[in-house]
Structure formats: structure tokens, C-alpha cells
Amino acid sequence: MPRLDVEKTIEELSLGEKVALTAGIDFWHTASVPRLNIPTLRMSDGPNGVRGTRFFNGVPAACFPCATALGATWDTELLHEIGQLMGEESIAKGSHIILGPTINTQRSPLGGRGFESFAEDGVLSGLLAGYISKGIQEKGVAATLKHFVCNDQEHQRMAVDSIVTQRALREIYLLPFQLAMRICRTACVMTAYNKVNGTHVSQNKEIITDILRKEWGWDGLVMSDWFGTYSTSDAINAGLDLEMPGKTRWRGTALAHAVSSNEVAEFVMDERVRNVLNLVNFVDGLNIPENAPEKALNRPQDQALLRRAAAESVVLMKNEEDILPLKKEKSILVIGPNSKVAAYCGGGSASLDAYYTVTPFEGVSAQSKGEVKFSQGVYSHKDLPLLGPLLKTADGKTGFSFKVYNEHPSESNRELIEQLHLVSSSGFLMDYVNPKIKSLTYYVDMEGLFTPEEDGVYDFGVTVVGTGQLFIDGELVVDNTKNQRQGSAFFGSATVEEKGSKELKAGQTYKVLFQFGTAPTSDLDTRGVVVFGPGGFRFGASRRVGQEELISNAVKLASEAEQVVVFAGLTSEWETEGYDRDHMDLPPGSDEMISRVLDVNPNAVVVIQSGTPVTMPWANKTKALLHAWFGGNECGNGIADVLYGDVNPSGKLPITFPVRLQDNPSYVNFRSERGRVLYGEDVYVGYRYYEKVDLAPLFPFGHGLSYTTFTRSDLTLTTTPEKPQYEESGEPITATVTVTNTGKVAGAEIVQLWVAPPATEVNRPVRELKGFTKVFLQPGEQKKVEIVVEKKLATSWFDEMREKWASEKGEYEVLVTGTGEGVLKSSFKVEKTRYWLGL
């Protein structure tokens, strides 16, 4: 279609058409006006891959490492490449808009979506978000910065009031958005669910209009988070352009009435529509047809990029006695619950059906030239493992039949609406549609055959947003239809997992029937949570095994093994949108397993997968420790590349790992209490707190070792002359450093530039990260690198009395760090205190 003449189109639109354009028509699409050639636009999650339009039975996609993993790369060029591939993935899914990146701030290790954001530091997070967005938009696809702002916990996320000082709001929580905008003016911004200082962000004029649009000069489209609109006139007047998803709750006839009664001025309505039409023009060059089919790419070059990203994200936490890299020629024992599980992404909006996955065991097995043995050690599932992949259909296919009916199972002569073949026994039905379904209330029979490999008692579990009963050979084993209890699955809208058990015989085939009723059939109290459409289901099973038996077997094998690697950590069950973790600990039994293995084999390598910090009570015992995050499709290969030395680890922690949860500055203020959460740590988030109170964490922000060694030398600073007021350039300061690879293997060094302020009018952090760069060096190679920072950004704090940034006069110390202990120091002066606003 030709580009729209926006102003002419606004004149030609009726009020009804304008109103329609300001709300989605379904979960993933905007409204169209065919008579004026205004097309519908498609959008898709999100943070670590482009899922497409279906949670349920969707088209597979590339899964990138989670955001904290990408944050650990500290690599803007890599993030730019990843953004470009995300753009291409979006086009393949027929999507004009990607709902990401996420750049909230991890004020606590417990945040359910902490893995979705890059870092606890605004400079690192903002620059990486800027470059990934730049890559996305270079492909013509619109990127969406989210969640604007202070959506830093899941507990009562739609109702909680985040009470935060203006200084902390500016210096910590808005800063990553501000810095990302300086690199890439994203086409879209998504508002947060929560309130900030008393007002929901989606109707907060100060945040949307005064700061984002006027102060920062941004002119894109502001959309709500899903069901995160809470008013008609207030939201429109504050600057919320688009309510998502459809069908609308707050616009439609209510908005038309508000305009006709001057609760919303017509020129304000036109502003909202103008931003929608400008977005249509922004993505016009994609030439994606309406209702485009969703396709898969999965090209060899994409797989190579995903593998490189997974390997670059791995952080070498410890490597005493050079235990790593391992020897491919030697035999190896692989232990642990994450060994044969592909923990490739977190849960919620970030989850997707990956093209393929590689488990750590598969990655190690592919590279080892010696014998590879396995021992489970412990299981770490929160809910019972999915039963679907263990089932067979009547004709021998893996999986089960999925039969949809309008009528309850008790009714005779039910009409079969649709039959599907599924493998996963976890389904979120919010985007499942069939024209024969009469309402949100319908029923599904899922049938398959289960043949156990071992005798024993088997536990079965059912979690639903709705109701569910599980039968084995006609016997009711699990009933989750009455007296339901609130759980955490499916964005916090599901029941807890109800369980039952049955003794089964190896080799005998049993008929499994799971009968599901959609969300309206539930008696669960869902106040305070979002129930997405028809709801969802999950059913699983596992043979009951004693933990001591598993650990003892692993310990015995470890005592005899030539090389041992233990894979433990979290999965999307433990870290997910919808709820926060209750603690920082690994799943039950994991710490005991690791500790006992280290007792008999001190050279065992420990690999932890999680998107956010975990406690490690055995950390002093281990000589070799890797942190591997949720690594995407190529997770297992990326880890194995580092374990065996094909890739020299270069990752640095983007978040602080405290010794214990109580050490974290948000410990006493991390949940909603009486409808609010107090950001009591103020600007002292993450490393800013630990350094201010001189409290040693387990592993600090920026930590990460290498298989080689580096030196940094010859620090010089080049400054520009001061002017009476800061101009747009911000008076650049260029730091030049010589970096030398003094070891025997090639590797990448991350050079970090920190600025320590002089004594000023207010308390400030000891030092703050202001810039960084990554450089690859062959053994013995030396390179000069430059880091450019703006004086106004490097020196300023937010003055609440003046409501401006303050760059106070004085001498500022520059500290340059990297791998190892060495610190280079220099300084520069600010001759005169200056105040400023803007981007």
C-alpha cells in the first residue's frame, strides 16, 4: 500500500474510525480502515525471540539467550546482530512490531521477570537495549521498549503502587530507557502495569507526556501492556495511544462519548490517531500482507549466531588450578537435573516453542572423544514433568489427541468440533480459536497411551486455569475441579498442581484421559490476576524415586570419574512472568547433591543455569564454576564450547550475586504491602549498595574470568572545553587504554570505565559504570581501545528541588577495570556547576 498522508487521513476519518484505531481488535492485531488504505498491524512477543501470534500450538521460532545472558556479553555489536536477526524472524512471522526489548531494573534477585532485562545498571542495560533495537529497526520492524516504568516485581503487578523518589526514578529506572533512546528512537514504548507514586503509568501524564514526549522529544506510539489500561479519558489524555489487546474494555463507545462530551478534546484524539498512523508508515516498507502466514527461518547462519551468543554469555566465576578447560580425550561423568533438560528460556511472555533445543548433556556428548556417563543426582522440577511426550496415540505417534466440544463430558451425543494432535501437555489457550466454539466455556478431552519403562508408583499432576480430571484406565487419579487453590502457573492465574498416584507395571500400556473445562468452569478466586481468555492446562507424571538413592549413586560415580561436570539451576518453572521467587535457593536437593559430589571429587566443574542470582553455599568448595543463564536454542552447545575451550569465556556479570538474600538492599521492601511497594533503597540498587556499605557479595557486578590473562595500561583522557550550558553533544570525554593479551590463548576483554564523584551536595554511589567496550586479542596481541562518555552523563545526579540534572563542579576520578585486579586511574574536572534537562 502507498504511504499514508497522515494529516489528510485524519481529516477523512470518522470519529468511530478514530476510536477503533486506538484499540486492538484481538490479542495481536490493530484495527484497519480499508476505505482509507489503513491496514491492520501485527505484533508479537518479544524479549528473546519472536513467537508469532500463538501461545497454543504455534509455529516454532528462534530462541535467543535470555536478556541477562545477553547482558553478560557486554557486546553492543553482538546485540546489534541479534536485533537484525530478530527483525528477520519478525518478518517471517508476519509481524510488524516486536514487543521488546525489556529494560526494567533488577532491584531484587527474586523478580519473576528479572531474566528478561539486561542488567541492574542503567548504562549497561540502556546501551544494549539501544543496539538490539537499532538492529531490529534496520530491518524495518518496529521495536518496543518496555515496561515503562518501575515494573520490577510480579507480585500484584497490576495494582501495586511503586513509591519511588524522583531522584531514583531518574537515575535508576528511567535511565536505561533514556540511554536506549539516544541510540535508537524506537517506534513504540509499552507502559507498565503498575502505578508510580499514586497513578497507573498508562494514565500518568507526567511520565508519558511530560518526560517521554516533551523532555525527551520522542514521537512514537505508546501502547498499554496487555489489559494494562484502567480508564478511558485519563489514559487518552495522558498520552496512551493504543489499548491492547482487543476487544477493547475502555475505548469503543465509551471513548466516543468522552470525545462528544469534551472529556477528551478532539485534537487530543487526533494526536493519538496520528501516532497510530505514523506507526503504519514506519513499517510500510515491510510489505507484509494482512493475516500473513507464519513461517520458520532456522537457517545455518542463524544457528551459528545463536551458538556464538550462548557461548559469549557464559561467565567463568571460578577456575582455581586451571581445572578448565576440560580435556576432550578423557572420559566424563555428567551429573544433575539440568543435564538432560533444555533450560533455554524463562517463562511467560518470553517463552516460545523453539525450532530445536540442545541440552547440556547433548552438547558435552557431541564434543567429548571419551566415554560420557550420566547420573541424575536429583530432580529439580517444580511441577511434575510433562506427560505428553511420553504418550502415544492409537496409531503410534508420540503425543495425544486433543478433542474439543461445546458440551460437558456428562452430556450424551456431544458434537466433536475439532481434533488436533499435540505433544506438549501444557497448553495456554488464550489464542486458540475455532468458529464453532459458542463461548469461552468449552471442554477438551485429551487421550493417549502410556507404557512405563519401570515398575513403581507414579505420581500424576494437574494444573489448570479452568477445571481438570485425569483418568488412568478409567480410574480417576487426579481431580482438580473443586476447592481449587491459587497457584503461580500461567501468569499467576492457575491453580496449584493437584496430585494423585497409581502403581504401574513396566511394559503394560495404560489409557490416559485428561478432561479439561475452560476458565469459566473454575471456582478459583482470580481477583488481582489476569485470566487470559479460555485459560490453560498442564498435566505431568513421574515415577516416584527417593532423593537419597539418586544422590548416593551420583556421589559413587563421581568418586571414580576422570572428569565430572554438574549441571544444576532453575528453569522456566522457577523463573517466570506472573510471580516472583520466594527465595534465592536452588530447587530442593540441588545444594546437597553439589556439596557431596565436591566432597568426593573436588575437581568437579559446577555449571549453574538461572536468569537471576541463586545462593551457592558450596561456592568455597568448588574450584571451577560457570554461570550459564538460559541460553536459547544453542544453550547446550554454547556451554560445551566453553567447557572444552573451543570458546574462551568472556562474559561478565550484569547483576550482583549476593551471598544471601538478606544482603540485598531491597530485602525488606520487595513485595506489595497494602497495595504499595516502597523503593526504600533509593539509588542504591545492586553494586551501588554493596560498595556504599562495603559489603562483599558472593560475586560482584562485572565479575568474570578468562582462560587467558590481560593487562591494561596507558590510560589517557581527552576532554572538550566547557561551555556555559551543556549542548546536545554533552562535551565528550575520550578515554584511551592499551589492552594486551598476556596469556597463551586468544580471548576477549571487556574494558569497563567507572566514574567516582567528588563530595557533592547529596550522598552518591562510590562509583558508577559510565562506559565499556569489548576487544578480541590473539596471544601477545596489543590494541588501543577508546571509550567515549559525555561529561554531562558521567557527572550528573538528579536534583529534586530544581527538577533538573545537576553536573556539580569538582574533580571526578576515572577508574578503568577489566579481568583481574588491576585498576587504572585518572581524573577530569568540571569547572562550573550546570543544570540540564533533555535526552
Swiss-Prot record:
The keyword RNA-binding does not apply. The keyword Secreted applies. Residues 395-555 form the PA14 domain. Glycans are attached at N197, N620. It is found in: Secreted. GO terms for biological process: cellulose catabolic process. Beta-glucosidases are one of a number of cellulolytic enzymes involved in the degradation of cellulosic biomass. Catalyzes the last step releasing glucose from the inhibitory cellobiose. This is Probable beta-glucosidase I. It comes from the Eukaryota. It is an enzyme of class 3 (hydrolase). Pathway: Glycan metabolism; cellulose degradation. SUPFAM superfamilies: (Trans)glycosidases, Beta-D-glucan exohydrolase, C-terminal domain. GO terms for cellular component: extracellular region. Signal peptide: none annotated. Belongs to the glycosyl hydrolase 3 family. Its main location: secreted. Its EC number is 3.2.1.21. The active site is at D225. Pfam families: Fn3-like (PF14310), Glyco_hydro_3 (PF00933), Glyco_hydro_3_C (PF01915), PA14 (PF07691). Keywords: Carbohydrate metabolism, Cellulose degradation, Glycoprotein, Glycosidase, Hydrolase, Polysaccharide degradation, Secreted. GO terms for molecular function: beta-glucosidase activity.
